Swiss-Prot record:
<keyword id="KW-0201">Cytochrome c-type biogenesis</keyword>
<keyword id="KW-0472">Membrane</keyword>
<keyword id="KW-0997">Cell inner membrane</keyword>
<comment type="similarity">
    <text>Belongs to the CcmE/CycJ family.</text>
</comment>
<feature type="compositionally biased region" description="Low complexity">
    <location>
        <begin position="146"/>
        <end position="156"/>
    </location>
</feature>
<keyword id="KW-0349">Heme</keyword>
<dbReference type="GO" id="GO:0005886">
    <property type="term" value="C:plasma membrane"/>
</dbReference>
<feature type="topological domain" description="Cytoplasmic">
    <location>
        <begin position="1"/>
        <end position="8"/>
    </location>
</feature>
<comment type="function">
    <text>Heme chaperone required for the biogenesis of c-type cytochromes. Transiently binds heme delivered by CcmC and transfers the heme to apo-cytochromes in a process facilitated by CcmF and CcmH.</text>
</comment>
<dbReference type="GO" id="GO:0017004">
    <property type="term" value="P:cytochrome complex assembly"/>
</dbReference>
<feature type="transmembrane region" description="Helical; Signal-anchor for type II membrane protein">
    <location>
        <begin position="9"/>
        <end position="29"/>
    </location>
</feature>
<dbReference type="InterPro" id="IPR012340">
    <property type="entry name" value="NA-bd_OB-fold"/>
</dbReference>
<dbReference type="InterPro" id="IPR004329">
    <property type="entry name" value="CcmE"/>
</dbReference>
<keyword id="KW-0479">Metal-binding</keyword>
<keyword id="KW-0735">Signal-anchor</keyword>
<feature type="topological domain" description="Periplasmic">
    <location>
        <begin position="30"/>
        <end position="156"/>
    </location>
</feature>
<dbReference type="GO" id="GO:0046872">
    <property type="term" value="F:metal ion binding"/>
</dbReference>
């Protein structure tokens, strides 16, 4: 093998190694930022056990909202068709947050309860992530979920 071929081979190996390293770093960064959506039924079945951080979606159970008098700490129960999960959140809740309203909380399980670091309330009558709409369609005791509910991925 002559010197020119050896140098060319060396550059090809370096470029491929750098590309592989870049792809690996991108994949790890994306995995760390992914947040999966689970319903209370899936959480109680243990499907969310392997995830440090995930989203919990469902309806706020009527009468379950309890606010601490001396802080911004709020606890409430998120329900779906078969299960309920207790949620704790410290912070200012969205204006649309109330009983029997669709909610998505981002956080982690801690000691049998979900500790949220972010709470999102349904912003209008047509918004609901498709997977949450499908999971909630059978058990929602309030108003029916419209068939025209906009999926999360649909452009607005």
């Amino acid at each position: 093998m002559n010197a020119t071929r050896r140098q060319r081979l060396w550059w090809v190996i370096c470029v491929l190694t750098a590309a592989a390293l870049a792809v690996t770093l991108i994949v790890f960064a994306l995995q760390r930022n992914m947040s999966y959506l689970f319903t209370p039924s899936q959480v109680s079945a243990g499907e969310a056990a392997g995830y440090q951080q995930f989203r919990l979606g469902g309806m706020v159970k009527a009468g379950s909202i309890q606010r601490a008098g001396d802080s911004l700490k709020v606890s409430f129960t998120v329900i779906d068709k078969n299960a309920a999960t207790q949620v704790e959140y410290t912070g200012i809740l969205p204006d649309l947050f109330r009983d029997n309203q669709s909610v998505i909380a981002n956080g982690r399980m801690q000691g049998g309860r979900f500790v949220a670091n972010e709470v999102l309330a349904k912003h209008d009558e047509t918004y609901m992530p498709k997977e949450l709409k499908d999971a909630m369609a059978e058990g929602h005791a309030g108003k029916p979920i419209p068939a025209t509910a906009t999926p999360l991925t649909a452009p607005r």
